[in-house]
């Protein structure tokens, strides 16, 4: 990455037009091959070489990303637009322009760069980016993101999840342009311009951050990824545009500075680091927020200073990684594409820094840093990816992104200052998400706050996030910082060194501690400890007081930035690391060198962690960006946190960053790297912060830090390529883990990405991915490609084939299992359907019965007035007698009514035309009395026909039931019919009122004697009703069947028992009425009821509890209205008797009931038919038993 940065810087220095370099950068960032083009200057050439390699890998990755980027840009734009209509529009506009083409973007950026010299350019940039500043901001951001995305995509592509990506496009747009502008201007601007603008931006940024934080929070609340973006957008809406424009302009201006800074950073590592830091801080934040999403953009523009930071922080937080990246990304794009361009932006940014533009430039610039760091970009990308993943990814992914990133930092510096203030928040946020965390960090940062400080932690978990964000941020910040950082750098450096030492020693540990995220940042943090410390110190306070702390943190961060910058970058890189591990390595070295030894080594380990973390972070960011974003709302605190994060980030980054493992870093470090950059930013920013104000500067610091890492990023970039190329060999990815290399590398010059074939053997060709001068690591610096036809190639092919076959086999087995499961499920469903059908049939009968009751009785309707009708058709009583019987058993009273709505079902059964008619009329509210009489006659007929022997009893029963019995019997059986007719006067209503009680009694009957009296009568009623219903429901078939079953098998017994029972029942009823047969009747009745319930539910309880018992209750009530009254007297005795004889009575009574029912059914077809068939045997059996007991 560093190389890339150098190239960018060089290009910028050369004065190569941002456009030329920008496009190349962009290409590179996009992963295109034209690294040569990029490297106009020797530095550029060198970087280009590295980039080429990286680009190659990236191109593979990024070529797609590029398309993705553009497509995504639109996509993102859309998504962002979704997030914010206005911002989206802006973004879209920008995006569209950006997506138009890298060249276009570069061109725009170039223009911006050219304009870079003045704050106008920034505005122009804005204009370029979008018609309106607001739009421009989004566009810028988005475009940047897009470019960045393209750039990032290569390495960061992994990071740039589509979700994230959407924001990414935005940044890419901006980025492409920015890089251009950044590129040329960068050289032009040089750190000086950069610094100057940077500082104002810083202060501005700081100012903005306070405001921004609210937006930030808003953003955070607004949207996770987009939230941050969104809200910031609102506040930043105009500002965002401005910011974006500013970033663009800023990019143009700052880029020169930053590029130089970056160059320095890239080349020197230390100076560049610092400047990047500042840009990162400022740019990062601003950039990030606007970039993140729509908000990215918007915030990028006008609000950049305040909002952007917020946005960065807030936007970034949500999509911080992504968003900041987007913001950064734009910058990164500018950075990567127009690293030079971006620098100008930053310069401009610095110039504009005072104004919101400053921030935007930072934002723009931010992309540059990501660009600067390919990995950084990646990281940024990651961050962006996380928040604005695609942006981030784009930016980071492509090597160019890396360049852009560097540029970005430069470009971003101006915004960075703004961004910085924001960025600190962002950092804070990033802290959390690392890349997105910077932005996102804030939310988590609160808790993360320290972690934030541990931004690295962020980087760790969110290396990508942090990286992206940090990178993006850092880049932005870096930009700013580059700018500011250069100015600040001296001061910052001093500060940084002091703080570094402080933080290193002080914060270092705290950051790790603070930064649970240390995981990536942990080491990074540790490495960063000193760096982190400053950051942390600041950071920590920052977390406590996001607004205030951020500045301090920023400062601290900044302080560390120099030392930390790389680490942060490392972290970022680490994030990106995966993609561009080598970048971090490279960058870290430079950053490290300048930054300070402290973080370099520790960061390296962290970087490794970062790398892993990066992935984690990326994942986290991707998943957690939202959360982070949400957390982000605490923008201000997050800011503080973020600021700390940068520090931590830096801290963490440096380790990953460490020269030890360029490739590793590339994978692992790049995120860290990015982180580093941001830390540098913070470091630088810190000085700026003090200068501008603690708040903004610290943020800038973090941003700046990222910038720092970006320079290393360039070298790292090479490794990223390697990483990309690593595709061929996973070993390359191991580069990320290479912590040993970082230590070894720390003394060695920063690695340059050369990607030249170094050795060819019979079986493989070795390519030197990194050139570390005298220090070289075969594992991290070389990768080999097996030659076709070699044993190794064959082995690998066989292995691949084997794996593929195994996978296919597994897939097949899985499919088989799945099919099996499906079949089982289907079978289960079938069973369930069957069950439901049977239940429905039973219920339908039951419900319908109730319905009938409802029909006649107003109260009933609640039950299921329409159900009866509906039930009937479904249930063809005679068709499924067995099922019905079962269902009825389940449904106590439904037994008979359960047999299809009796009223309706009866017609189906049509056994008892009269009964059915009667039932139906009852249902239809026929004259109860008439129905009753009709039914009594019918029942008598049925009974006579069914059971001559029993006939008498039924007749008696009818008389007994007389009003309740006969009328009620059939009617209750028929549902409402019985109710109305049975208890025409009393029963209908009494039943209803007593329905609950009756039911309860029925339940109690099963449960206890207390309710049994009613139960017994109710039972009888239910039984009778069921009989009648059954007869009706079953119709001839059921009736005949029941008769056959009942009569034939146990007819005599049944009839005898039934007669006995009936007599008893009648007696009981009479007794109940007259309180005569309390015991016997209750028993008989109770048993009857119980029996009925048994037949119905096979258990009295089921019957009683069943809802249908309402029907039954009605029946019972109908029957029992009088009975109930009687049972009242019988209640006690019956209760006792029933309870005592419950078991006995139940079985005996069940039998009797069954017999009775059967006889009754015979008498009253409805009941008889359904329950009897199945129940018949059971009942006969029970009957025999009951006969003995009874």
From Swiss-Prot:
InterPro entries xrefs: Atrophin-1, Atrophin-like
Residue positions, PTM Phosphothreonine: 653, 669
Per UniProt, location of the Glycyl lysine isopeptide (Lys-Gly) (interchain with G-Cter in SUMO2) cross-link in this chain: 1183
Site positions (Cleavage): 109-110
Residue ranges, compositional bias (Pro residues): 158-174, 541-553, 693-718, 739-752
GO cellular component: anchoring junction; cytoplasm; nuclear matrix; nucleoplasm; nucleus; perinuclear region of cytoplasm
Keyword Nuclease: no
Region (Disordered): 1-608, 622-767, 785-862
Annotated tissue distribution: Widely expressed in various tissues including heart, lung, kidney, ovary, testis, prostate, placenta, skeletal Low levels in the liver, thymus and leukocytes. In the adult brain, broadly expressed in amygdala, caudate nucleus, corpus callosum, hippocampus, hypothalamus, substantia nigra, subthalamic nucleus, and thalamus. High levels in fetal tissues, especially brain.
Residue ranges, compositional bias (Basic and acidic residues): 17-29, 45-63, 108-128, 795-839
Modifications the protein undergoes after translation, according to the UniProt entry: Phosphorylated in vitro by MAPK8/JNK1 on Ser-739. Mutant ATN1 sequences with expanded poly-Gln (polyQ) traits are more slowly phosphorylated. Proteolytically cleaved, probably in the nucleus, to produce two C-terminal fragments of 140 kDa (F1) and 125 kDa (F2) each containing poly-Gln (polyQ) tracts. F2 is produced by cleavage by caspases and is exported into the cytoplasm. In vitro, cleavage increases with an increase in the number of polyQ tracts. C-terminal proteolytic products appear to be the cause of cell toxicity. In vitro cleavage at Asp-109.
Modified residues (Phosphoserine): 34, 77, 79, 101, 103, 107, 632, 661, 739, 746, 748, 896
UniProt-annotated stretches for the region Required for interaction with FAT1: 879-894
Disease: Dentatorubral-pallidoluysian atrophy: Autosomal dominant neurodegenerative disorder characterized by a loss of neurons in the dentate nucleus, rubrum, glogus pallidus and Luys'body. Clinical features are myoclonus epilepsy, dementia, and cerebellar ataxia. Onset of the disease occurs usually in the second decade of life and death in the fourth.
Subunit: Interacts with NR2E1; the interaction represses the transcriptional activity of NR2E1. Interacts (via its N-terminus) with FAT1 (via a C-terminal domain). Interacts with BAIAP2, WWP1, WWP2, WWP3 and RERE. Interacts (via its N-terminus) with MTG8; the interaction enhances transcriptional repression of MTG8. Interacts with PQBP1.
UniProt name for this protein: Atrophin-1
Taxonomic source organism: Homo sapiens (Human)
